[in-house]
Amino acid sequence: MPQAPETLDGWYSLHLLYAIDWSSLRLVPTEERQTIVDELQTFLNKHEEARTNHVGDHAFYNITGQKADILLWALRPEMKDLNAFENEFNKLKIADFLIPTYSYVSIIELGNYLAGKSDEDPYENPHIKPRLFPELPQSEYICFYPMDKRRNETYNWYMLPLEKRQELMYAHGKIGRQYAGKIKQFITGSVGFDDFEWGVTLFADDPLQFKKIVYEMRFDETTARYGDFGSFYVGHIVTKDNLQDLFAL
């Protein structure tokens, strides 16, 4: 049986996507609607403490297109912490005007294909630890999509020898490293947690970089032969300064 590579796992991850029920929200008096948005802002402010105390983080983005209107991504030390985060959000007044469109449960993951043998605790490595327990960038744009490694009669990633998978992942990683400084990437593993095997979350100040990296990787053997993808969600950051504009009517 082919050898399964070890993974390094960090914070648990929850992507929540919603459509806004504008028709219902439009019926709410202006003063009451302002109270609803203020409560949402208080919620977001409160959870910035997780970032400050380094026990998690979150990102909030306005999604482009009709698949969703907002994306809320939360990272926490334990899965039950994600439940608490989601439950608290669902009890906000704004939740009465949100329609869930998609969610994704996973965990920050670093593949160990290329790791050498070492007695060092990787969780204490100053280069690895911030990638497992990250402070999320406040980039202008986000791109999220789930994916699988293909497994069928012709191409089955999981039946490849470890050495071949290592070779392919090395070449795959070289492409990603060319976008250092342009894109910040987070891989979350979801085998046993959700319908796909991984989630990919990209941050950039220029959304064109999302197209460039995904297109270039289409020609990489790892993706061309073994990659299957779900829906792509792209959006612009929601900050304290533009939250009011998002819900303005």
Swiss-Prot record:
Involved in coproporphyrin-dependent heme b biosynthesis. Catalyzes the decarboxylation of Fe-coproporphyrin III (coproheme) to heme b (protoheme IX), the last step of the pathway. The reaction occurs in a stepwise manner with a three-propionate intermediate. One of its GO terms (biological process) is heme B biosynthetic process. Pathway: Porphyrin-containing compound metabolism; protoheme biosynthesis. PANTHER family: COPROHEME DECARBOXYLASE, HEME-DEPENDENT PEROXIDASE YWFI-RELATED. Pfam families: Chlor_dismutase. It catalyses: Fe-coproporphyrin III + 2 H2O2 + 2 H(+) = heme b + 2 CO2 + 4 H2O; Fe-coproporphyrin III + H2O2 + H(+) = harderoheme III + CO2 + 2 H2O; harderoheme III + H2O2 + H(+) = heme b + CO2 + 2 H2O. Belongs to the ChdC family. Type 1 subfamily. The active site is at Y145. It comes from Staphylococcus saprophyticus subsp. saprophyticus (strain ATCC 15305 / DSM 20229 / NCIMB 8711 / NCTC 7292 / S-41). GO terms for molecular function: heme binding; metal ion binding; oxidoreductase activity, acting on the CH-CH group of donors, oxygen as acceptor; peroxidase activity. It comes from the Bacteria. Keywords: Heme, Heme biosynthesis, Iron, Metal-binding, Oxidoreductase. This is Coproheme decarboxylase. Its EC number is 1.3.98.5.
